[in-house]
A protein has these predicted regions:
Chain A
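N-terminal Lys/Arg-rich, disordered targeting/topogenic segments
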Residues: 1-6
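Short, solvent-exposed recognition patches
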Residues: 32, 37-149, 154-155
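Hydrophobic membrane-insertion alpha-helices, especially the h-region
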Residues: 8-31
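Surface-exposed amphipathic alpha-helical segments
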Residues: 155-180
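Residues at structural and domain junctions
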Residues: 12, 37, 56, 157-164
Length: 180, 329
């Protein structure tokens, strides 16, 4: 193997690496463009206040009752104002930092927050009266067989969904404390 | 169901991601051929086929590896998230979602009018149906030219037609069809080179790669990148057969002369179809460019039947595309 051969091989590798770098850069620019053209697309925010002020969302629904086992503030906040307003707050358990509660609100019934908590089976679906609002409570188990529950209702044009890795009774208490 | 819901449903996501993955794969594979200085058409063809095979399986495979790949968290950390474009209205007038559907529609129309319909209408034989076709007799110029090319002599048919043309049928009864015009216009050594090229097609027809690739290409009918990549792979197939013909005849100049004569043949005009004269002109120009490139590489002595030594580069390219496409949702 001559020096010339090694140099040529190195140039080929460099040339391919540059190709990949250009494609990655191009993709990043193309991913950035929509946000630049139309601010308000889904993004992460450091705080509830930052999301509200940054996107002009007048009301973000937060529970007044908050179990001690959960950490405050939210571990993650995702929000958008385009194509419709939506906020997703994820709360971690104090002990291990695992996401155990997700609260989402969206001005569209089609919004699916792809939450970190995934139901494996739903064993019960119960209609519920939540301070005069019609709510739907679902109870079942998550992938790791732990108890999971979900409750959803409409607050005007905003659909609120709470998903928790806990029995339904705790989730109902949190939901009741969100009534205005 | 509105467009956003359609694009967010499983088939919609599969189509969008296959489209994007084929685009990135085609660009990277194309540039990789240049960057790695790949010369063998056998290897070049495999590079082009990455954009034909990969996107069919990439989305279900990635979802199987990571079911959360479609989640908001994943999308926020990706290189490119297509959903950011769907609801965008460019200059508050032009919605980007329907634009994508338009691009997919154009690719589908090209597939229908340039590939599927012509194949369904295809007539066997290079000349018009009224032409007389006879089997080449022993000792005839064509039969003599084909002697000793590769084991058993190929079955040759002579078609009564003044236009110089040649093609092979590789189905149940493989045979080569030559026109009387071709036999008359070529020197014996050129005729041998032309037949050798067709014998190469017949030999390679036993390999299912291009047939399977065509099935994949049909599945990705909506992807412009796959269309282009498949055509480039098909062009490499011609070069592979050129190289085999040069190997057995030892006369690249003779094959180059054949291609030059066929370039000007009316029989190689693109068949009529309903897509209009403009499209036919583009096809003709594209065909002519391909033939000229083949003539050039034969004249430059670039023909090679080597197909080893570049597999590591191929593996690196496939791996790079697979990793990159994982982050394109």
């Amino acid at each position: 193997m001559t020096v010339r051969h090694v140099t040529r091989q190195a140039l080929h590798i460099l040339s391919f690496a540059v190709t990949l770098a250009v494609v990655v850069g191009l993709l990043k620019v193309l991913n950035w463009v929509p946000g630049a053209l139309e601010p308000g697309l889904m993004a992460r925010y450091p705080s509830i206040e930052a999301a509200a002020s940054g996107l002009g969302i007048r009301q973000i629904y937060v529970p007044a009752y908050f179990p001690e086992s959960l950490r405050w503030p939210p571990a993650g906040i995702l929000a958008q104002s385009k194509p419709y307003q939506a906020v997703v707050m994820e709360f971690a358990r104090a002990g291990d930092g695992q996401i155990v509660l997700v609260i989402s609100q969206a001005a569209s019934p089609n919004f699916e927050p792809d939450v970190a908590i995934r139901f494996d089976t739903i064993s019960e679906t119960i209609p519920l009266d939540l301070g005069g609002r019609k709510a739907r409570l679902e109870a079942g188990a998550c992938g790791d067989r732990s108890a999971c529950s979900r409750i959803q209702w409409d607050e005007g044009k905003v659909r609120i969904v709470l998903t928790m890795k806990a029995p339904a009774v705790e989730l109902v208490r949190i939901a009741q404390s969100m009534q205005h | 169901m509105d467009l956003t819901n359609l694009l967010n449903a499983y088939p919609g996501i599969h189509v969008v991601q296959a489209f994007l993955h084929s685009l990135s794969a085609a660009i990277i594979a194309d540039r990789a051929i240049v960057a790695w200085n790949i010369r063998s058409p056998v290897i070049r063809q495999k590079f082009h086929l990455i954009a034909v095979f990969g996107p069919v399986f990439s989305y279900p495979l990635y979802q199987w590896i990571n079911p959360d790949r479609g989640s908001m968290h994943f999308r926020l950390g990706t290189l490119f998230d297509s959903s950011r474009w769907f609801n965008l209205e460019l200059w508050n007038v032009l919605p980007a979602g329907p634009l994508l559907v338009l691009v997919l529609g154009v690719a589908t129309a090209i597939f229908l009018f340039q590939e599927l319909i012509p194949i369904l209408r295809h007539r066997p034989g290079p000349a018009d149906p009224a032409s007389r076709t006879v089997r080449a007799s022993q000792g005839s110029p064509a039969a003599s030219a084909a002697e000793g090319l590769d084991g058993e002599a190929p079955v040759l048919f002579i078609v009564e037609d003044d236009d110089p043309a040649i093609h092979s049928v590789t189905s149940r009864s493989p045979a080569i069809y030559l026109t009387t015009g071709l036999v008359r216009s070529l020197q014996p050594v050129e005729l041998r080179a032309a037949i050798a090229h067709e014998v190469a097609h017949m030999r390679r027809s036993g390999r299912p790669l291009l047939t399977v690739a065509y099935v994949m290409r049909v599945l990705l009918f909506f992807s412009v990148a796959t269309l282009v990549a498949f055509r480039k792979a098909a062009a490499e197939e011609e070069k592979i057969c050129d190289d085999w013909a040069v190997k057995v005849t030892g006369r690249p100049d003779a094959l180059a002369a054949v291609l030059e004569k066929l370039r000007h043949s009316d029989a190689y005009e693109i068949e009529d179809h309903e897509a209009g004269e403009g499209l036919r002109s583009i096809e003709r120009i594209s065909y002519d460019l391909m033939v000229r490139e083949r003539i050039r590489r034969l004249a430059d002595g670039r023909s090679t039947t080597a197909d080893t030594g570049d597999w590591l580069k191929f593996a690196v390219t496939v791996a790079s595309i697979a990793i990159l496409n994982y982050y394109i949702v």
